[in-house]
Amino acid sequence: RFEKKMEAQPNSEAKVEIRTFKDHYEENKHIVYTIREEMAKKTPLSQIAILYRTNQGPRQLIGALMAYNIPFYMQDAVPNLFDHWISKNIIDYMKLARGDMRRSTFLRVMNRPKRYISREYLTDSEVSFDDLLEKVKDKPWLYEYVEDFKEDLRIMKNMTPLMAINYIRKSVGYNAYISEYARFRKIQEEEFTHVLEELQESAKGYDTYEEWFDHIREYTEELNRQSKENGESKEGVVV
């Protein structure tokens, strides 16, 4: 935490500006633009601080600072958005759509939302929809679930990450799954929808899954580096 010392500055020329933005994406763009303006004026980055109410607040901003190569360091550890189980579910759907049909990946999302697919049908390390459909052909209702799952992944194959997240939430039925899960666990649904909204913000501007996955790797590496260097002398914008 920062030690705070507050003093009135009646003669200060600086003014407090209050701005509102339609979303975090636009807000972060403005923050980056303002910092770059200060950098052009040779303002020391150590004189710039970005304050948030909680340590989850700056998750999207960190990605924006990295994209523009703006040095920064964090006073507190920031939870990695992409480590959340909901994020991992969304990423697993994308991996399946790209053709990564490993049994372990398939198992994690095959019943999110509920499709009543039993793990007993998955006997190989790689899942084949043709084999799975053959095994459930005597159960028309289950056959339809599996066919729909296969078709959803086919449709997602060439989507942008943002389009895919929207599709998973609405067309695949992940929003309904989250609602049911929250009711069952007696947890506020907003906690989960907030994660999905943050994922959507993160995915903006990426054309392919590979590009977004590269960003996720770089973001995770930076968080890990910041965590290891915590307490050391640092230069950059303070977050």
PLM feature segments, named:
Residues 1-71, 98:
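Helicase P-loop NTPase motor core
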Residues 5, 48, 75-77, 120, ...:
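Residue-level detector of family-conserved "landmark" positions at structurally sensitive sites
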Residues 7, 77-80, 228-229:
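Short, solvent-exposed loop/turn elements at beta->coil junctions and helix N-caps
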Residues 15-16, 87, 236-237:
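A residue-level signal for beta-strand positions that form part of recognition/binding surfaces
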Residues 21-24, 51-55, 79, 114, ...:
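Short beta->alpha junction loops/turns
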Residues 27-30, 34, 89, 198, ...:
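Well-ordered alpha-helical segments embedded in enzymatic catalytic cores
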Residues 44, 59-64, 91-239:
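Conserved helicase C-terminal RecA-like lobe
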Residues 75-98:
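Short alpha-helix plus adjacent loop in nuclease-associated cores
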